[in-house]
Structure formats: structure tokens, C-alpha cells
Amino acid sequence: MEFSSPSREECPKPSGRVNIMAGSLTGLLLLQAVSWASGARPCIPKSFGYSSVVCVCNATYCDSLDPLTFPALGTFSRYESTRSGRRMELSTGTIQANHTGTGLLLTLQPEQKFQKVKGFGGAMTDAAALNILALSPPAQNLLLKSYFSEEGIGYNIIRVPMASCDFSIRTYTYADTPDDFQLHNFSLPEEDTKLKIPLIHRALQLARRPVSLLASPWTSPTWLKTNGAVNGKGSLKGQPGDIYHQTWARYFVKFLDAYAEHKLQFWAVTAENEPSAGLLSGYPFQCLGFTPEHQRDFIARDLGPTLANSTHHNVRLLMLDDQRLLLPHWAKVVLTDPEAAKYVHGIAVHWYLDFLAPAKATLGETHHLFPNTMLFASEACVGSKFWEQSVRLGSWDRGMQYSHSIITNLLYHVVGWTDWNLALNPEGGPNWVRNFVDSPIIVDITKDTFYKQPMFYHLGHFSKFIPEGSQRVGLVASQKNDLDTVALMHPDGSAVVVVLNRSSKDVPLTIKDPAVGFLETISPGYSIHTYLWRRQ
């Protein structure tokens, strides 16, 4: 649901404490101890008539954040984004020794430890690379810094399609010569060598954190497929263990070899992007069908051993890479087979049918059955459903969909969350089947400009503040409430709490940390906050 567009006056200006606090008398009372910080570079807001604003960036200017630092012991930092136009604005406050608030109490339970986080990121598709490289070099650099640098939101995961997908401008694989079972003609095209690989290297150079690469194939070469086409209903010819399956498994190793020659190593591969898609007649773009039994046997007999016996034996293998609706069934089929299970490190999930599949019955049940197999959210975007507008520049609701999904996933044992295209054009492409969708960054090459959407900042409320190795801990509410909340601890023991308010009501609240005291604050309607403090 969209809401009325904010006026220019609602958008952020470099303003004093009085202006910032004037929006809420309750906020003024609760946060009187808070001093507002003015560092970094503010958002230049622009409204396109949707519920909030985008931040405008070009070759000479882009909003930015200061590198992450924790406040002194006894104080806390609060980063705030709101529908009315604030974007990760920093304030600091004093942790109180006594509880004076009367509203909601959130109590940190650090002794309750859950999963350790892998991280957050997005996909370097052909479309994303084309859009980024269509900007002038200075604008390209500011876009990449926004995502990957410590002045940005600190992404540490990049998903890389293995050859073409729908977000390509042509269909291709790395081995299109028919019946080349030895893959003698395997080669990376310019989409990899001129577009994706150089940009990935630039991202890695800008990042202060280690960045993990994740690869996923959409289709095999057509000569390995039952239908002889990149799209539509089709799977690998033959049976697991035969020449078709062995060749397809070796294709993964060839891909990893080729990227290694370009000095890029992968953290993980998924066995197939959306394997259920290739079981559907008339599926419009690149796919390769697997039933759970077929994927189990392909992993056990072909892909698992081939990776394990290669120089890439440290690369993790993730199964599924499809809708969580398919859980826990797919996990039961694959992971109860010891020959397949020994090669599987994790289960990747997509978000598109989450509205049909409650997290507890899918993610929760799968974790209960297979607690040692990690869950990882590998793809999400808005605007893909037939009833949705592809791009809604400045949609706050779409940002809230992202942060609500991330919090829900974290609460159900997921270790990372990956967006889809890093950047798209105002149409939501390019996409060779016109399957246009939205993206946290939209590039307008006619103006050498890019727009950072609310989705970008909602993601940043997690990615910047929750580094790899952070661990989710308990957080208990004193009463039923409309907030989405999650708590984590950094590897050094510092605390992070994210609070999302998807309602229109301001919610006074107190965060209690038994080790240090009480954080008195407020969650305004349609806002997201990240709180940080030292515990020792």
C-alpha cells in the first residue's frame, strides 16, 4: 500500500536539533539527552510522487555515511530513516541507570545465542553491470562506494549469475558448441570479462570488509537439455552419473577456474537457480528443471564429488535456491540421503512466494530438522508480480517489505540476505523477456544520475551495522506490539538492535540491556532505526 507523497518541506535538510526533534513532542521528551551528529554528506531528496523520496547522486555528489564507530561506554548511537525523508541520520544518547519510561520494554537476552551472520549484498547481473558502466567513471565510483565502502552500507556478498539470465540482453552459456562434452570450447564472454569481473574487482577494492562471491547457474547449454532450449520445460538429458550430468558438473569447475584466472575466488555456488522453474511448461526465461530427487542424485553422484575432487573443494554448495514454500520437503529429500548431504553446506531461499509460506512452517521447521545446515536468503526484489508496477521511485512501502523480510529471516535462523540486481534503469531493466522489476538503485543514464531508493537504506540498516560473524541473541518484548525487532552481538560483544515500525503510530519504547542499563527512545510511525552500544 502506498501513502501520500511527502512535500519538499518534509525532506531532510542539514538542520539543527530543534528542527529534527520538532516532529514529535514525545520524541522531544524521550530523546532530550540525544545530541544530533552532523557528519557525512546528507541526502539530496527528490519526490517522484510515491510515498517517500529518493536520494539523488551524480558524478560530483552522493550522500554518504561516516565509517562505523561505536559510541563511548554508557552512550548509544541511533541511526534513523523515516518515510518523511530522513536517511540513516545519526544521533547519540545516554544510557540510563534506571527505567523511567512507561511504554514498551525490549529486554536484551545475550545468553540466548542463535545463528552467526554471513552477511548482506546484491547481484552483479549483466543488467546491473550495464547500468553501472553506462554512468561516467566518477558516478560509477560513487555508486560502488555507496554499496561497498565504509562510507556506504558495507555490502559483503555479491551474487554472480553463471552466464545469462533474464537480466541479460541476449541468451548465452559458456559452452554453446554442441556436444562439446570435454568443454574444450568453454569460455567467458565479454559480459564477464568486460562488465562483471572488472566491476567486482572495483567493489572488492572499495570494501573494507572481506566480500564473499556466490555463483548460480540459470541454464545449462541447450545440447545438454531434454528440450534443447534455454527456457521452457526442460531438464538435463539422461540420468545422474551419466555423461550429461558429469559434463554439467564439470561446467561448474570450469567456471570457477575461469574466474580464478581473473583472480576471483568464490565462497559458494548454488546447485541451480530456481530448479522448480524448469518443470513448468512455457517458462519464459533461462531455467533448468530439477525435482528434489533429481537434485539429490545430481549432487550425490556428480556435482558434489566433482567439486570435492577439484581445486575448488573449499567452495560451499547450497541446495534449493528457490522459494521457501518448497521447504521442508526439498530439505528432507536431499539431506536425508547421506551421499548428498555430505556435500551440502546450506539451503538457499528466494522470497517471491513468502506470502504463501509462513516462515515458521518452512524456515523454522527446516532448521528444527537440520540444525547444522545453514539457511541463506539468496534473492529478493519487488515489482516482479504481474499486478505490481515495476519501478516505484521513492516507495517507502517497498523499503519496509525489505526490512520486514530481513528481520523475519533473521528470527528464523537465516544467516544472510541477498538482494537481486544492484542497479537497474528507470524501466526496471534491461531484461530480454521484459521481466522488469525494481532495484535499490535506479540509474538514469540520460542525466548521468542514479537514485538511491528507500530499499537501499532499509538494507543499509542491517548491512552496515551487522558484520560477518555477528550473532543473533534474544530480545523479549514486555507486551504485544506492532514493531519488528531483532538483536545481535558483534564479534567484539557490542550490541545492535534494529527496530522497524510499519504502522502510522509513534511507539515510545525502552531497550533494556542488563549489563549497562536502559535506552529510552521512540519509534516514529513508518520508520526504521538501528541502535548500537558497547557492553564493556
Curated annotation (Swiss-Prot):
SUPFAM superfamilies: (Trans)glycosidases, Glycosyl hydrolase domain. The active site is at 274 (proton donor), 379 (nucleophile). It catalyses: a beta-D-glucosyl-(1<->1')-N-acylsphing-4-enine + H2O = an N-acylsphing-4-enine + D-glucose; a beta-D-galactosyl-(1<->1')-N-acylsphing-4-enine + H2O = an N-acylsphing-4-enine + D-galactose; cholesteryl 3-beta-D-glucoside + H2O = cholesterol + D-glucose; a beta-D-glucosyl-(1<->1')-N-acylsphing-4-enine + cholesterol = cholesteryl 3-beta-D-glucoside + an N-acylsphing-4-enine. Pathway: Steroid metabolism; cholesterol metabolism; Sphingolipid metabolism. Pfam families: Glyco_hydro_30, Glyco_hydro_30C. GO terms for biological process: autophagy; cholesterol metabolic process; glucosylceramide catabolic process; lipid glycosylation; lysosome organization; regulation of TOR signaling. The keyword Amino-acid biosynthesis does not apply. Residues 1-39 form the signal peptide. It comes from the Eukaryota. Disulfide bonds join 43-55, 57-62. Interacts with saposin-C. Interacts with SCARB2. Interacts with TCP1. Interacts with GRN; this interaction prevents aggregation of GBA1-SCARB2 complex via interaction with HSPA1A upon stress. Belongs to the glycosyl hydrolase 30 family. This is Lysosomal acid glucosylceramidase.
